[in-house]
């Protein structure tokens, strides 16, 4: 088709335009490369197709040379660019390998006197904050040690033991509130001592008036010696009662005055001496101290002593004196020797420091405490 177009005489006038246009395009790349330009085509004749024949191969050769030259330039440029990139990457790797040992830490600036003063001031402030934080933590742990059911003047619980005991104590109280039942002393101590060390377990058992050896033996038992309700068997412990009034209340049950038929409890030999003494004093089998004026005052809100709630009775300062179990009943005939000398204040003794007050806040007055104290005796015999 191209040969036919160039051979037609009607298109001869357009051929020089294509030739001159091709020469104009080829001038710039040839001048850039430094090659000698081809000779200009001869001027067209008056009417012969000679100029068409002479001009026909010129644009084709120019276009083919230009395309070949451009392709070579592109290939050389691509190869050169790839080589430069590879060289730059190799140089970067070499520089990185050479600089790695130098970048192990931040560059230390020169410590001036002002910077030293600022650093010292920041360190002092940080030390003060840490000291205050530890003081607050120790104060909070001391307050926590006061409310957990484990107190000793000679032994101090560690921080982790205090937190574990507090967690167990909160769990035990939540279980008591959830069930609404009076807890068994052995199971209560087992709940408190879960996850604690042996010294802490012994301390908790001693604070709750439970023999640690009996506690360890009863842990594997199937519930023998526990509180099963009215008429159940009870195990005696060689510890005295924490309240000296419990013996008188037990004697009321032995004499048949305080609802002894409702609870078939085991009586003890030392109650008979108390009963005869109180009957001779005119108390009708009850302790004469219950009729004194110091028990007529109103009851104050319950207090928490060593983790156990107790009801404190307000009284005048004249009646504030200390009661000792062995001193109070040592002169009585047939009195039972005590294994421990527990000293309680008058308010603590009259309030009945025991764990049974945990749920029974509606305590009766002292002249109506027979059945309740029978249950307390049964609880502490477990």
Swiss-Prot record:
DNA repair in keyword set: no
Compositionally biased intervals (Basic residues): 101-113
Superkingdom to which the source organism belongs: Eukaryota
Major localisation: nucleus
Any coiled-coil regions, as ranges: none
Bias (Acidic residues) ranges: 78-97
Alphabetized PROSITE patterns for the sequence: BHLH
Region (Disordered): 1-129
UniProt entry keywords in alphabetical sequence: Activator, Developmental protein, Differentiation, Disease variant, DNA-binding, Epilepsy, Neurogenesis, Nucleus, Transcription, Transcription regulation
Annotated GO CC locations: chromatin; nucleus
Annotated ranges, domain bHLH: 121-173
SMART domains: HLH
Listed GO MF terms: DNA-binding transcription activator activity, RNA polymerase II-specific; DNA-binding transcription factor activity; DNA-binding transcription factor activity, RNA polymerase II-specific; E-box binding; protein heterodimerization activity; sequence-specific double-stranded DNA binding
The keyword Transcription is assigned to this record: yes
Known partners and oligomeric status: Interacts with TCF3, TCF4 and TCF12. Interacts with CDC20. Efficient DNA-binding and transcription activation require dimerization with another bHLH protein.
Medical condition linked: Developmental and epileptic encephalopathy 72: A form of epileptic encephalopathy, a heterogeneous group of severe early-onset epilepsies characterized by refractory seizures, neurodevelopmental impairment, and poor prognosis. Development is normal prior to seizure onset, after which cognitive and motor delays become apparent. DEE72 is an autosomal dominant form with variable severity and onset in infancy.
Annotated protein name in UniProt: Neurogenic differentiation factor 2
Organism name: Homo sapiens
